[in-house]
Amino acid sequence: MLEIGSPNALFFRTNTTCNNLLRELQKIWVEIGETETEKDRMLMELERECLQIYQRKVDEAANSKAKLHQSVASIEAEVASLMAALGVLNINSPIKLDKGSKSLKEKLAAVTPLVEELRIQKEERMKQFSDIKAQIEKISGEISGYSDHLNKAMNISLTLEEQDLTLRNLNEYQTHLRTLQKEKSDRLNKVLGYVNEVHALCGVLGVDFSQTVSAVHPSLHRTDQEQSTNISDSTLEGLEHMIQKLKTERKSRFQKLKDVVASLFELWNLMDTPQEDRTKFGKVTYVVRSSEANITEPGILSTETIEQVSTEVDSLSKLKASRMKELVMKRRSELEDLCRLTHIQPDTSTSAEKSTALIDSGLVDPSELLANIEMQINKIKDEAQSRKDIMDRIDRWLSACEEENWLEEYNLDENRYSAGRGGHVNLKRAERARVTINKIPGMVDTLIKKTLVWEEDMQKSFLYDGVRLVNILEDYKLTRKQQEEEKKRYRDQKKRQDLLLTQRESIYGSKPSPRRSSSFRKPNGFNISNGNGSVPPTPRRGSVGTTTPDVLLTPRSYSGHHRQNGYFKEVRRLSTTPLNYVAMQKEDTVSTTYTSIYSSEPDSPLQG
């Protein structure tokens, strides 16, 4: 029995059907009356048509088989390609596992799910690559500054199929993306830092910040989110150039304002401007004491501020010009006062009379004249500093001379040893004065040495009120020596007079002198006279007419004696070691009495 669906059963069923149809056809032919030739012809035609149908079916089956083979091969190639692109190495193809036991359709059905899965993985991987590449290209465009052009190119590049979709390649893209993101962050921070610096500089300079940064790139001052901040190299370079430009402008304005404020201070000080008038410029006065980098107050270097200060300087300059003569006279007076204090002769080229004449005639700019006087004041101050040690020694010497003068007057006081009020104080002072007086020669010698050293160092003479100090000191030493010699001669003559008086008393006896009452010391000075001029006058402090050698001149009295200097009218007269003038006065009176006995006139000279 034939199995249903088997090829033999199909062939048997076909033959049976064909035979039945052939018998029915032959029966029809008989009824029609077809000839045998016609029957053979139609049978041959029928057989040919059947063969054509079989052949067509065979061809269709062969084509179907070829297509299946091609599909299987294509799928295998696609699987291999997807696995290679995705970098999948742990998946085996079902076709390769069982090559002979399965039909083509079974093989195709077995590999289709794997292909679908690999296709899904590829799409997801391509999406990851697309996202990363989009971010990379966007950041690269922001860095390079050509974002619009790169966005168009990015859309084209993303449509192309990616050949390498492995995780290794994806990690490389991600690493590159992170690098670009870090660079973007650094650039953004750098741009923001530059923008903040520009903002600070614009604030100090009083410049419009929005216009300044917009000139570099419009995105730097946009409040909307339509365009992100540009971080390209050109923007960074533009900001750096703008910062350098603003710093240069700040330096220029700072120096200009500093000069103007310095001029303002100078005018304030010259014109004694009250503090309330200076207060309104208080915010700019600290510029003189500050460095450029520390200037941060908004608008402090704006053109308006500089113009405001400049206007004030111009106003004060005009006022100064009208008061310049007064200022010149004032500074000249200060110069003369300083010269008086330091005993230095002022420069006569800027004297009050000459300065007034020059200003009135218009031959000299008052500012130049004032600057010249200021220079002289500074010069006097510097010279006074170098003269300080010598001037201190001069003061100590003059103080010793004052003590010597006091001791001279003290010795003329007949009541100096009385027990009256203050007597013991004067005795102590007299002792100290004698010690000080003994140091005067050493003081003078040291002062001469110091002065000569100063003159050698400074290469000029040390002048005291216009007279060379060394000459004054040498004259002082000479005069002091002459006085010592005069006193010595006086003492020798006094001894001879005492001896003569003793001899006369032994011969004639002592007799009261009728002139003793007139020999007492006068209030205005002490004068010793023997009636015949043989006894030289002793030094005294009163304004009694005496010769120059009898008076020791200090620097001040020397200047007044030789130069008639109006600044120094005080005459200091010094003596050497003091004598007992009271005792000498009494003895001189007695001597005069006895001398008058042998003279034809009461005041006739002694008869040797």
From Swiss-Prot:
The UniProt annotation puts the region (Disordered) at 501-565
Q: Which cysteines are joined by disulfide bonds?
A: none
Got a GO cellular component term for this one? preprophase band
Q: State its location(s).
A: Nucleus; Cytoplasm; Mitochondrion; Cytoplasm, Cytoskeleton, Phragmoplast
Which InterPro entries did the record assign?
MAP65_Ase1_PRC1
Q: Where is this site: Microtubule binding?
A: 419, 430
- GO BP: cell division; microtubule cytoskeleton organization
Per the record, residues carrying Phosphoserine are: 513, 604
A single GO molecular-function term is: microtubule binding
Coiled-coil portions: 164-186, 368-388, 467-503
* Keywords recorded for this protein, A-Z: Cell cycle, Cell division, Coiled coil, Cytoplasm, Cytoskeleton, Microtubule, Mitochondrion, Mitosis, Nucleus, Phosphoprotein
Pfam families per record: MAP65_ASE1
What segments bear the compositional bias annotation Low complexity? 510-523
Provide ranges: composition bias, Polar residues.
526-535
Which family, according to UniProt?
A: Belongs to the MAP65/ASE1 family.
* Quaternary structure and partners: Forms a dimer. Binds to polymerized centrally located endocytic MT.
Q: What does this protein do?
A: Microtubule-associated protein that mediates the formation of a mesh-like stable and dense network formed by individual microtubules (MT). Confers MT resistance to high concentration of NaCl.
Q: What is this protein called in UniProt?
A: 65-kDa microtubule-associated protein 6
- Organism per entry: Arabidopsis thaliana
Q: What is the lineage of its organism?
A: Eukaryota, Viridiplantae, Streptophyta, Embryophyta, Tracheophyta
